[in-house]
Amino acid sequence: MDVGSPEAFSESGTLGVEEEFFVVDEHGVPTAGSDELVYEGEPPEPIAGRLDHELFKFVVETQTPTLNGVAEAPAAIREVRAALVAYASEHGLRIAGAGLHPGARWREHEHAEKPRYRSQLDRIQYPQHRNTTAGLHIHVGVDDPDKAVWVSNRMRWHMPVLLALSANSPYWNGFDTGLASARAKIFEGLPNTGLPTAFESYAAFQAFERRMVEHGGIEDRGELWYDVRPHSGHGTVEVRAPDAQADPAVVDAFVEYAHALVTEYAQRYDDHPDPFSVTGLRRELLDANKWRAMRDGHDASFVARETQGAVDLGTVVDRECDRLGVSGIRDVYDDVSGAQQQRRILDTHGEKRLYNHLSL
């Protein structure tokens, strides 16, 4: 049975970054290429052993090595991307980044042959058949399993903030959805996604994970696709809310923010006299804020966590930067959002320019 172990949670502050990308042709149009890149070729360092298939044959995922902290992340992210772009170029292919590719029509593309994905397609059917999404996943090491669950519970409020800042997928299946992040809505069609309820302890989380596997809800722990989760294999808190990005500086900002959040909450846990007191974060409120994020992107406002009324994204960003000593998310917020950029480019210059804009 593929479930994790509390012993995996042994290191604090380590970092790993997983990015999903689209394989495109010379014109920036999605094309099958993952088999060629993953199985038929020999990926170079630093992506040897860290390049994998995703559900569709035009989507791949990269992983950085385990990093000792956030300071190492920008260089590692760029080294992985440069290696992937060069490797794809050798095969006559290019790489693009976004939550959804505006030129991808899911009925026109093949799914991967990997048995795990074939099993998911059989079990989940339509929601997985149309799942052309690409995301950014950030792992931060936590040295205690109960602490990882406590941190994950509190991280839930911040996932709509990350989603709003990252919103980079207005187009799906050839049309404008009217959303800033259609990826988030498409992905929520799968089971075991979105913002989870709070868990009382690691034992409660592990019992849930084991029960889901034993009774056929999932085949392995990796199919708990929540926006944030304790990863019982890597010993991390994994943040899965953001859309994928073409610009590595935007990825840097989200990595900095996620790492700072996990680090700060981990310290709070160590200082807290009653670590598993009630969090006060209702799932319904979190879902409402996620909807605002996926619909409005940078223009989102959120139901306030501890007071009456709403708070706009800009105010949240200012408070978080001041509280945590980070700056990247302010730069992201001050810039035009990914969704807005895509719409402006398509309206002004057309598809060809948009596809080039999304290419690495």
UniProtKB/Swiss-Prot annotation:
Entry annotated with the keyword Ribonucleoprotein: no
Enzyme Commission code: 6.3.2.2
An annotated GO BP: modified amino acid biosynthetic process
Molecular-function annotations in GO: ATP binding; glutamate-cysteine ligase activity; ligase activity, forming carbon-nitrogen bonds
Catalytic activity: L-cysteine + L-glutamate + ATP = gamma-L-glutamyl-L-cysteine + ADP + phosphate + H(+)
Entry superkingdom: Archaea
A Pfam family assignment: GCS2
Annotated keywords: ATP-binding, Ligase, Nucleotide-binding
InterPro entries in UniProt: GCL_type2/YbdK_subfam, GCS2, Gln_synth/guanido_kin_cat_dom, YbdK
Disulfide links within the chain: none
Statement: the UniProt record of this protein carries the keyword ATP-binding: yes
HAMAP family found in the cross-reference section: Glu_cys_ligase_2
Functional note: Catalyzes the synthesis of gamma-glutamylcysteine (gamma-GC), the main low-molecular-weight thiol compound instead of glutathione in halophilic archaea.
Assigned protein family: Belongs to the glutamate--cysteine ligase type 2 family. YbdK subfamily.
Name assigned to this protein: Glutamate--cysteine ligase
Designated gene of the protein: gshA
